[in-house]
Amino acid sequence: MTKQDYYTTLNISNTASQLDIKRAYKKLAIKYHPDRNQGNKTAEEKFKKIKQAYEILSDTKKRNLYDQYGHSAFEQNNNSNNEFHSSFTTSTSDFNDIFGDVFGDIFGSNKKNRKEKGSDLQYNIILTLEEAVKGIKKEIRIPKLDKCQSCYGYGSAYGSKPSTCTSCNGHGQIHMRKGFFSVQQTCSTCRGTGTMIKNPCKICFGQGRIKKSKKLSITIPAGIDTNDQIRLNNEGEAGKYGAKSGDLYIQIKVKKHPIFKRDENNLHCKIPINFVIAGGSIILYSSFRGEITVPTLEGKINLKIPSETQSGKIFRIRGKGVKSVRKGFQGDLFCKIIVETPVNLNSFQKKILYQLGESFKNYKGENNSPKSKRFFNSVKKFFNNFTK
């Protein structure tokens, strides 16, 4: 049974932020929680799926594995002891956790020292079809703002430490009371970090990060396609003052192939075959052999061609397409036969074709070209009705 995509389960895109994931989970979990749907088995199953999707996508390491390999990343053991498939339990505290700090997420957190995460980066990789289908390792170099190794990203000079902000007492937030309401705002002095740097690092000038180029080894999974993304957690730009780094998104583009055209997990190719024509009749050159050689990404194979095969006929070769990067099944190869009209004929070849035409019951070869006969009969009938 095909499992639903975790992003689809939470009604979010695969580029959703952690905050978006958390909001989506809370919204759906509140709706389908068993405490609100007692006796409703459908809602209970839905809640299980929502909770499982959240457990994977809210964990950066698990999410990275899922983005690259899909459900198969968590099905290697295929048993109940799989660490990524926890048992289903519910409680009142679990229900309360869903509400938790939902308003804090939207209007500002009450947690101290929330530092701004570093920016996400994107790197474009162009692959050949063979590389995309079989998978490959690529070495790339990313220019970015990385953590300063002199101050370990905190911005203070060696031997000193950031001091607590006196404006917010290290909370990063300032509470302002207006009548009956208390409004929470980011501290303008420390910009929400909760700390102040009195003795800045001379290497990064107190920023906690410097410009550098970092070399990375990227594993491209087999079956990846154009517009797919690979997410590398914490490989984006470093955050200021020791904050968490952003993520790196590898954007995939597959080059056009001279033989094959890809359609999801299937491959398509056109195979030209010689023929002899006389009076509209077509005889495949391949009919004398019975089979032709067909290219695949795994090597050559033989394909039997029935006699009198017409141009445009498509043959399906199962299991010779692309293996799905997520679902694991193998696509097929579709070969379209293109009957090629011969050109540059000499007098001897023209004579043979003429003799072939003469061997038919009449020169038009209607018995050998039934489609042509039906077409011209329809044309004749059309003009007869047109002139009445």
UniProtKB/Swiss-Prot annotation:
Residue positions binding Zn(2+) 2: 165, 168, 187, 190
SMART domains listed in its UniProt record: DnaJ
Alphabetized InterPro entries for the sequence: DnaJ, DnaJ_C, DnaJ_domain, DnaJ_domain_CS, HSP40/DnaJ_pept-bd, HSP_DnaJ_Cys-rich_dom, HSP_DnaJ_Cys-rich_dom_sf, J_dom_sf
Cofactor note: Binds 2 Zn(2+) ions per monomer.
Any one of the GO CC terms: cytoplasm
Protein location: Cytoplasm
Stored Pfam families: DnaJ (PF00226), DnaJ_C (PF01556), DnaJ_CXXCXGXG (PF00684)
Per-repeat ranges for CXXCXGXG motif: 148-155, 165-172, 187-194, 201-208
Domain of life from the UniProt record: Bacteria
Keyword Transcription regulation: no
UniProt zinc finger (CR-type) residues: 135-213
Location of the J domain: 5-70
GO MF entries: ATP binding; heat shock protein binding; unfolded protein binding; zinc ion binding
Cofactor: Zn(2+)
This protein's UniProt keywords: Chaperone, Cytoplasm, DNA replication, Metal-binding, Repeat, Stress response, Zinc, Zinc-finger
GO biological process, alphabetically ordered: chaperone cofactor-dependent protein refolding; DNA replication; protein refolding; response to heat
Residues that hold Zn(2+) 1 according to the record: 148, 151, 201, 204
Subunit and partners: Homodimer.
Similarity remark: Belongs to the DnaJ family.
Protein function: Participates actively in the response to hyperosmotic and heat shock by preventing the aggregation of stress-denatured proteins and by disaggregating proteins, also in an autonomous, DnaK-independent fashion. Unfolded proteins bind initially to DnaJ; upon interaction with the DnaJ-bound protein, DnaK hydrolyzes its bound ATP, resulting in the formation of a stable complex. GrpE releases ADP from DnaK; ATP binding to DnaK triggers the release of the substrate protein, thus completing the reaction cycle.
Notes on the domains: The J domain is necessary and sufficient to stimulate DnaK ATPase activity. Zinc center 1 plays an important role in the autonomous, DnaK-independent chaperone activity of DnaJ. Zinc center 2 is essential for interaction with DnaK and for DnaJ activity.
Protein name as annotated: Chaperone protein DnaJ
Gene: dnaJ
